[in-house]
């Protein structure tokens, strides 16, 4: 079926993972009410009448903090497989990982110096 026989289960998982949301969206398209006016355009707030407008401005600190979090979260995603296969990869992979970590530490120092981690 697949060129890499060890990955048949993974391919099946990917197909199911793509089919379930697609099936949910298609089912919603056929079963949902067709009304486009009135209550459908209102903001839903826990079954209560909405209080105030739906558009509010967030402080930029939330975005900066989230951006720094995403950067270091992605770092963890990249470093975990490297740590698992550390003994097989050799010295070159170790040097590459050190360069990667150094770049991220420079980015952390820059964010710290610019005050992106300050909350006050």
From Swiss-Prot:
Keyword flag Mitochondrion: no
GO cellular component, one term: NADH dehydrogenase complex
Gene Ontology biological process terms from the UniProt entry: photosynthesis, light reaction
Subcellular location: Cellular thylakoid membrane
Enzyme Commission number: 7.1.1.-
Protein origin, superkingdom: Bacteria
Gene Ontology MF terms: NADH dehydrogenase (ubiquinone) activity; quinone binding
Keyword Transmembrane helix: yes
Enzyme class: translocase
Gene3D superfamilies (UniProt xref): NADH:ubiquinone/plastoquinone oxidoreductase, chain 3
Parts of the chain that traverse the membrane: 6-26, 64-84, 89-109
Assigned protein family: Belongs to the complex I subunit 3 family.
Name this polypeptide is given: NAD(P)H-quinone oxidoreductase subunit 3
């Amino acid at each position: 079926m697949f060129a890499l026989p060890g990955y048949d289960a993974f391919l099946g998982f990917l197909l199911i993972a793509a089919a379930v949301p697609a099936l949910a969206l298609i089912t919603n398209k056929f079963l949902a009410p067709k009304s486009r006016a009135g209550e459908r355009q209102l903001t839903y707030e826990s079954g209560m009448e909405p209080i105030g407008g739906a558009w509010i401005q967030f402080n930029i600190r939330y975005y900066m903090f989230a951006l720094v979090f995403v950067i270091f979260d992605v770092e963890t995603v990249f470093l975990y497989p490297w740590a698992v296969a550390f003994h097989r990869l050799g010295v070159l992979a170790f040097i590459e990982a050190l360069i990667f970590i150094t770049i991220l530490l420079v980015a952390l120092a820059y964010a710290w110096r610019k005050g992106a981690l300050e909350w006050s």
